[in-house]
A protein has these predicted regions:
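Short, basic and Ser/Thr-rich N-terminal targeting/leader segments
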Residues: 28, 45-47, 85
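Conserved NTP/Mg2+-binding pocket subregion across the NTase superfamily
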Residues: 1-8, 71-152
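Helical scaffold of the NTase/Pol beta-like nucleotidyltransferase catalytic core
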Residues: 1-33
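Residue-level marker of motif borders
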Residues: 31, 43-45, 91
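Short secondary-structure capping/turn segments at boundaries of alpha-helices and beta-strands
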Residues: 18-21, 35-40, 75-78, 86-89
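Catalytic metal-binding acidic patch
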Residues: 36, 40-72, 96-98, 102
């Protein structure tokens, strides 16, 4: 593994640790998960850190500057998109690391039924980082018990 990749992984690990603390202390965050390549344990140098924040108040988490305690003051928003219920905010940090925040209503993790898009995210790799009410664990269990293509 190159020194550059090791440095990128250290920066990502530090960001993930901060995200766990942020999620645990922000009253608007009901749960948080790491998804994608870092959740699968297969990040590459170009991989971004993908975090999904569940909330009862999506608009509160979309307020500009809301994630500054997590990302730092010098982050740069490079993309904002909406994918169904998921509001994507992609940032480039001063270190060069890209971070993709997905802000979703808590119902995104519903298991009755599981949304096919949500199931795809879970199958692509999901590690629960903050889940005080067990919502993400129940979602992961429901998806794990199914097969791709099943109606959940």
């Amino acid at each position: 593994m190159s020194a550059r990749l090791k440095g990128r992984r250290r920066a990502a690990a530090a960001l993930i640790d901060r995200a766990i603390g942020f999620a645990a202390t922000d009253p608007d965050v009901t749960a948080m998960a790491l998804v994608g390549s870092y959740a699968r344990g297969t990040p590459r140098l170009a991989s971004d850190v993908d975090l999904v924040f569940l909330t009862g108040d999506v608009e509160a988490l979309l307020t500009p500057g809301r994630f500054e305690p997590l990302l730092g003051e010098r982050e740069r928003l490079v993309r904002a998109r909406t994918w169904g219920p998921l509001h994507e905010r992609r940032f480039r940090l001063r270190s060069g690391l890209h971070v993709e925040l997905g802000i979703v209503p808590a119902a995104w993790a519903s298991v009755d039924p599981v949304d096919p898009g949500t199931a795809g995210v879970v199958r692509g790799g999901l590690l629960t980082a903050h889940d005080p009410d067990g919502r993400l664990a129940a979602l992961r269990d429901a998806v794990d018990a199914s097969r791709p293509g099943d109606v959940l």
